[in-house]
Design a protein with these regions (language model features):
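Short alpha-helix immediately C-terminal to the canonical SAM-binding loop
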Residues: 36-40
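Conserved acidic E/D residue at the C-terminus of a beta-strand in Rossmann-like folds
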Residues: 32-34, 114-115
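Conserved SAM-binding strand-loop segment of SAM-dependent methyltransferases
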Residues: 48-54
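Class I S-adenosyl-L-methionine
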Residues: 60-68, 78-257
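C-terminal target-recognition/interaction regions appended to catalytic cores
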Residues: 210-362
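Conserved beta-strand positions in the Rossmann-like core of class I SAM-dependent methyltransferases
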Residues: 8, 29-30
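Conserved proline-anchored active-site loop of SAM-dependent methyltransferases
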Residues: 7-21, 65-83, 111-116, 163-167, ...
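A short, Lys/Arg-enriched amphipathic alpha-helix followed by its capping loop at the start of a domain
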Residues: 20-27, 45
Length: 362
């Protein structure tokens, strides 16, 4: 069996991107995640090669010298997001610099950045491109763009910016696949009724995550008035007295708020960190009068039921919502592996990884 290409995942979170690349044939050798419970989730699923540290501290202390074939990651995206207003001075916007420092120090052949769509038009996105070219990477309009996860077998309309670059030669983004997955397919086998309101154990997996909130009578009234595919405007038409004043004053936009999913198409939403709050987006179950559960959100993100989650229910929700859907990552990984093979790239030898990993641990 050929030696696999070696992978480093920065800002790895729970490991959705690692999972997809591993499915595509890569071997994860190092990951970095500063949030301790997120890193523990990663460790439980992929092994002890995760560093629960701030990437800035690692780079300042000498950096990562472990050689790798590919570096992947999503520098914290809140500083670029439309949802967070004007964040010109947000320190998280500078995290790309440390990412590119690791790209340089690992001497990787390919790197992949995943982020919110605004990254591509931001000064930081343009700076990533400039730095990549300075380091000798091929990067072009064909290797970066906005992809929709539903075009890659993920049952949600998640739009993400992808930047790919290669030292070997021109690389292109993956092409959409034909097998679109519906909410019904994604939630097959999940009972309609949640089993609890709190986590019973941690690490939690599969049905352990089928937990629901205790809605107030007013919330239940609101849920019942939202038809399949409907949203807050249906509530306003049917029951103005149950509609918050701020929604009534906001006559445009916000069409996902208090939205209900449809069974037979991908979710018309992005699974975010507060998917258990329907006032935050289109998170009502297709036919039950409740928000989706953690288990259902993980399914819509294409995580397998065997995946182990660590932390409180709120922290697990953040991990689920922040994650790159593994199926999306798998298609990106397959494109990267195809590119490496087309150029006859040899994987970093295992003994070089072992030697460098020993130095990192020390």
């Amino acid at each position: 069996m050929p030696d696999p290409y070696k992978l480093v995942d920065l800002f790895c979170g729970a490991g959705g991107m690692t999972y997809g690349f591993r499915e595509a044939g890569f071997e994860p050798i190092l990951a970095v995640e500063k949030e301790k419970d997120f890193a523990e989730t990663y460790r439980r699923n992929f092994g002890d090669h995760v560093l629960a540290q701030d990437i800035a501290d690692i780079v300042d202390a000498g950096g990562i010298t472990c050689p790798a074939d590919v570096v992947i990651g999503g520098p914290p995206c809140q500083g670029f997001s439309n949802l967070t207003g004007n964040r010109a001075n947000d320190p998280r916007r500078a995290m790309w610099r440390f990412y590119m420092d690791v790209v340089e120090s690992t001497q990787c052949k390919v790197f992949v950045v995943e982020n919110v769509p605004n990254l591509l038009s931001s000064p930081e996105g343009k700076a990533i491109v400039r730095r990549a070219k300075q380091l000798g990477f091929h990067i072009s309009e064909q290797s970066m763009g906005i992809l929709r996860a539903s075009d890659f077998g993920v049952p949600q309309n998640r739009r993400r910016a992808i930047i790919m670059a290669s030292r070997l030669g021109p690389i292109t983004l993956p092409q959409p696949v034909s097998n679109r997955m519906s909410v019904r397919q994604a939630l097959k086998g999940v009972p309609r009724k949640p089993t609890a309101t709190e986590l019973r154990r941690t690490p939690a997996k599969g049905s352990d995550l089928h937990i629901a909130r205790n809605p107030t009578p007013k919330s239940l009234e609101r849920y019942r008035l939202i038809p399949p595919g409907g949203n807050r405007f249906d509530l306003q038409r049917a029951a103005p007295h149950l509609t918050p004043d701020c929604w009534i004053r906001k006559t445009e936009g916000g069409t996902d708020l208090f939205g209900r999913l449809l069974w037979d198409e991908p979710a018309r939403c992005t699974i975010r960190c507060e998917f258990y709050k329907p006032e935050k987006g289109r998170y009502l179950h297709p036919s039950e009068d409740r928000p989706i559960t953690h288990w259902e959100a993980a399914r819509l993100q294409t995580f397998p039921d065997s995946f182990k989650w660590c932390g409180t229910k709120i922290r697990i929700a953040i991990q689920i919502g922040n994650a790159v859907p593994p199926m999306f990552a798998k298609h990106i990984g397959e494109r990267v592996r195809q590119h490496l093979e087309e150029f006859g790239a040899c994987p970093v030898p295992a003994h070089r990884v072992a030697m460098a990993s020993g130095r990192e641990a020390a």
